[in-house]
């Protein structure tokens, strides 16, 4: 991958992370996940008379029609809900969606951590591991969010299946824009996570490709003597001695092996090397 493509992918992952975090924050804090309508069907003209209409989020229920029109109530997660405000079907729906509430919160927490690590990785590009860690957090955030969305949908569908149908009653529901924001956030978060992990793999592969072999740092002068490359290998010397001792030992070795070095066939043609 070229440097231009890598920069574009990095920028795109950052934009997806910011948009996903913003959309999920809006979705969690707003009250437009679900719209519910209840009423009766007039037998004469088969028209529908709306008795109650509301929209709900993860924390509140706001009424659009009925006796409590214009009022909002906090969803009680510990104490049982007041069944006098709505019908039994609506209360059961609001009770069952409680099981899905913790997952968007966990997803928002993971997404925030991934966003912070992603920004730190862009500020300090040599920390390539941060791109991988942020990608993992983004993927975990998306998985937690999709589990919450599936539980939210299944809770409503289960109540609709168990509800006794009556020809004279009207019950309708639809998902709101807060739910749509959460679903879009899932797609953006997963995309940002996959791109972050992909960038880490590309950077890691590039570092290994351009890293020289360790043998390149230890060339030998020639093959005619076992001691010809020793002076280029500091790790071959015995450690714990002073530089003067090392220099003296090297001089003694050169003097003791000088007759053997004269046997090198190229010695007469070389003036700067003993071989």
From Swiss-Prot:
GO terms for molecular function: channel regulator activity; monoatomic ion transmembrane transporter activity; voltage-gated calcium channel activity. One of its GO terms (biological process) is postsynaptic neurotransmitter receptor diffusion trapping. It is a multi-pass membrane protein. The chain crosses the membrane at residues 8-28, 103-123, 129-149, 176-196. The lineage of its organism: Eukaryota, Metazoa, Chordata, Craniata, Vertebrata. Belongs to the PMP-22/EMP/MP20 family. CACNG subfamily. It is found in: Membrane; Postsynaptic density membrane. Keywords: Cell membrane, Membrane, Postsynaptic cell membrane, Synapse, Transmembrane, Transmembrane helix. One of its GO terms (cellular component) is postsynaptic density. This is Voltage-dependent calcium channel gamma-5 subunit. Regulates the gating properties of AMPA-selective glutamate receptors (AMPARs). Modulates their gating properties by accelerating their rates of activation, deactivation and desensitization. Displays subunit-specific AMPA receptor regulation. Shows specificity for GRIA1, GRIA4 and the long isoform of GRIA2. Thought to stabilize the calcium channel in an inactivated (closed) state. The L-type calcium channel is composed of five subunits: alpha-1, alpha-2/delta, beta and gamma. Acts as an auxiliary subunit for AMPA-selective glutamate receptors (AMPARs). Found in a complex with GRIA1, GRIA2, GRIA3, GRIA4, CNIH2, CNIH3, CACNG2, CACNG3, CACNG4, CACNG7 and CACNG8. Interacts with GRIA1, GRIA2, GRIA3 and GRIA4. It comes from the Eukaryota. Gene3D superfamilies: 1.20.140.150.
């Amino acid at each position: 991958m070229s440097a231009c493509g890598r920069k574009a992918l990095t920028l795109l992952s950052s934009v997806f992370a910011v948009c996903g975090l913003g959309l999920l924050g809006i979705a969690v804090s707003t009250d437009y996940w679900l719209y519910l309508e209840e009423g009766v069907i007039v037998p004469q003209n088969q028209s529908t008379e709306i008795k109650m209409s509301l929209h709900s989020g993860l924390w509140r229920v706001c009424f659009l029609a009925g006796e409590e029109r214009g009022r909002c109530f906090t969803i009680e997660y510990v104490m049982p809900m007041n069944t006098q405000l709505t019908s039994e079907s609506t209360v059961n729906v609001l009770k069952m969606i409680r099981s899905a509430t913790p997952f968007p919160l966990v997803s928002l927490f993971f997404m925030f951590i991934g966003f912070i690590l992603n920004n730190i990785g862009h500020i300090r590009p040599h920390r390539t591991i941060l791109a991988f860690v942020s990608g993992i957090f983004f993927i975990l955030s998306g998985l937690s969010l999709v589990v919450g969305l599936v539980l939210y949908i299944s809770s409503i569908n289960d109540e609709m299946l168990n509800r006794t149908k009556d020809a004279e009653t009207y019950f309708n529901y639809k998902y709101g824009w807060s739910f749509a924001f959460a679903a879009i956030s899932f797609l953006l978060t997963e995309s940002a996570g996959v791109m972050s992990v992909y960038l880490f793999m590309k950077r890691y592969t590039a570092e290994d490709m351009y890293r020289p072999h360790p043998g390149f740092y230890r060339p030998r002068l020639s093959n005619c003597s076992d001691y010809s490359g020793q002076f280029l290998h500091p790790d071959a010397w015995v450690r714990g001695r002073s530089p003067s001792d090392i220099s003296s030992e090297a001089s003694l070795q050169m003097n003791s092996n000088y007759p053997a070095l004269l046997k090198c066939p190229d010695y007469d043609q070389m003036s700067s090397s003993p071989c």
